[in-house]
UniProtKB/Swiss-Prot annotation:
Disulfide bonds: none annotated. Belongs to the periplasmic pilus chaperone family. GO terms for cellular component: outer membrane-bounded periplasmic space. This is Chaperone protein FocC. The gene is focC. Keywords: Chaperone, Fimbrium biogenesis, Immunoglobulin domain, Periplasm, Signal. Gene3D superfamilies: Immunoglobulins. The keyword Transferase does not apply. Residues 1-21 form the signal peptide. The keyword Chloroplast does not apply. One of its GO terms (biological process) is chaperone-mediated protein folding. It is found in: Periplasm. Involved in the biogenesis of the F1C fimbriae. Pfam families: PapD_C (PF02753), PapD_N (PF00345).
Length: 227
């Protein structure tokens, strides 16, 4: 592999959901079914003039590096207009919860190659980290994932709206509205709850929302009732 020296006075890191400039990931989330030996994630450099050093790693739900999943190759160089495949391998040894999904994060850092014309100069270097969900999904969960969005429950608590998720799946909730009031997007863990603020002036009315499915697409709008 070609070795790059990144020589700059400043190296700045940014976290973004999926892609930066010419470097893009092939999905917005990765589902890892229990029992599968590995899953794959495509990485593409769409920029024909730029090369990147790609570094990848897995973090747990708290944002700490986690060895329960192995990602390979962890480091490689990528020329313009090329595609590579990251392999994610289960190293959990059967030690994951069997009644719900578990959340991890896939991180892919793209470091642009140094411009040889600027060798010895001080300039700003941007390294971008794309970060997407990795959801480990056990077999035999009580309901299929397609039914989970309609199971959300809503209650008013301390001036906010509490979302309770009784399902075994992580639910990413978007386009959430209370009456005509738009609320913040959120992610509700399995068997867990999250509270979001309700803007002043809400006097009741239907709750409507969408969720994001396994393919990164929005589901149809769902109506909920505040209990």
């Amino acid at each position: 592999m070609r070795i790059w020296a990144v020589l700059a006075s400043f190296l700045v890191f940014f976290y973004i959901p999926q892609s930066y400039a010419g470097v893009a990931l092939g999905a917005t989330r990765v589902i890892y079914p229990e029992g599968q030996k590995q899953v794959q994630l495509a990485v593409t450099n769409n920029d024909d003039k730029s090369s990147y050093l790609i570094q990848s790693w897995i973090e747990n739900a708290e944002g700490k590096k986690d060895a329960r999943f192995v990602i390979t190759p962890p480091l490689f160089s990528m020329q313009g207009k090329k595609e590579n495949t990251l392999r994610i391998i289960d190293a959990t040894n059967g030690q994951m919860p069997e009644d719900r999904e578990s959340l991890f994060w896939v991180n892919v850092k793209a470091i642009p190659a140094m411009d040889k014309a600027k060798t010895g100069e001080n300039y700003l270097q941007f390294a971008i980290v794309s970060r997407i969900k990795l959801l480990y999904r056990p077999q035999g969960l009580v309901i299929p994932p397609e039914q989970a969005p309609g199971k959300l429950e809503f209650t008013r608590e301390n001036g906010g709206l509490t979302l309770f998720n009784p399902t075994p799946y992580y639910l990413t909730v978007t386009d959430l509205k209370a009456g005509n009031k738009s609320l913040e997007n959120t992610m509700v863990p399995p068997q867990g709850k999250v509270t979001v603020n309700i803007p002043g002036g809400y006097t009741g009315g239907d709750i409507t929302y969408k969720t994001i499915n396994d393919y990164g697409a929005l589901t149809e709008q769902v109506k909920g009732v505040v209990k």
